[in-house]
Amino acid sequence: MTGTRPESKSAAVAVETFLAVIDAPLAAYLESCVHCGECAEACPFYLTTEDPKYTPTHKLRPMVRAYQRHKSPFAPIKRALGLAPDEVTEAELDEWSPLVFDSCTLCGRCTIVCPMGIDIAGAVRKMREGMTAGGFAPADLYMAADRAMTTGSPLGVQVKALKKTIEIQEKKTGIPVPLDVKGADYMVILSAMEEIGFPEVIGALSRLFQQAGVRWTISTQTFEATNVGIQMGSKAVAA
């Protein structure tokens, strides 16, 4: 393994992880789907494109097949009789990677409208665990995870850069930004994208907190809020 990314892709590792994360509640969800299509009507990606491949339950298909072949009721008998689905292949997981990572924000709209009460977004989150373990997550996510593990920020933002950004905002607003204040009422944590791409957020927060008359602070030890491990489905990185 190079950093957080496996040295090579492995459908077997992905399937093994799928099976490991399919607990009793998720198995019940997978068995409960009636393929009504309600989730599609709630998905922004389907509504925008009207392409069936963006149906939320379709995004789960490789994990569902792994479950049906290896872990569903009577799976051994079905395999013996040739009735079980084929093994999930590397090519299929490559094809599904954009659907699982790039075409789902885990917004949960599909979960809300599901008449069977299936937590579809939660299932996609668990499917990402298998995809990531097998090496099928987007390369950018692995690189962001490596930076997060080494620097604490997925974009590699360091304290020096944060302080420089704060200094610029202090000059623009005329309001000092308190750092590492013990006993503050509020502690602000920022995403790396806000720190780099939208630094005016810090200035806006300064104005809000000053108007509210409360004590607040930004910690130079824990200023990064982005948890790329949750985004990519890696418990090790998320921890």
Spans of features found by a protein language model:
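N-terminal capping/interface segment
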Residues: 1, 46-47, 66
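DNA-contacting interfaces and partner/effector-binding or oligomerization modules
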Residues: 2-15
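Iron-sulfur-cluster electron-transfer modules
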Residues: 20-30, 60, 64-239
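Residues that scaffold, gate, or flank divalent-cation-dependent active/transport sites
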Residues: 37
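Short, non-ligating residues that shape and space the ligands of small metal-coordination modules
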Residues: 42-45, 49, 116, 120
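N-terminal cofactor/phosphate-binding cores enriched in small/glycine residues
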Residues: 49-62
